[in-house]
């Protein structure tokens, strides 16, 4: 038995136009992007990660899509709260949204 390893899969990239617009004119209440296209963009990588986890008992995969997306959309902002600082970085609110699910897979308690 080895050391437990958690692979943190990529999260859906934010929409550049939407994020830029919110910086110029202020945040919109709710913004999202198409979940199917975002999942397709990273399908090859997620398949590789899940195959790795299936091959090794000590490896598990944390999938941010399970928190940030539903079947149709990936949320960029909800009720005026921005989940991204730019297309590639989560905001503090976005990170805090992922925290409970990450804590669960890591087996730690959030204080």
PLM features: what roles do these ranges have?
Residues 1-111:
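Extracellular glycan-modifying ectodomains
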């Amino acid at each position: 038995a080895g050391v437990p390893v958690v692979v943190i899969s990529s999260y859906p990239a934010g929409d550049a136009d939407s994020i830029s617009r919110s910086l110029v004119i202020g945040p919109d209440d709710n913004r999202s992007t198409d979940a199917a296209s975002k999942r397709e963009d990273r399908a090859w990588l997620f398949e590789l990660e899940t195959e790795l986890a299936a091959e090794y008992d000590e490896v598990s995969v944390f999938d941010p899509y399970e928190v940030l997306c539903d079947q149709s959309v990936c949320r960029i902002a909800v009720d005026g709260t921005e989940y991204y600082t730019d297309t590639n970085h989560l905001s503090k609110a976005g990170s805090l949204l992922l925290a409970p699910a990450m804590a669960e897979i890591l087996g730690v308690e959030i204080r």
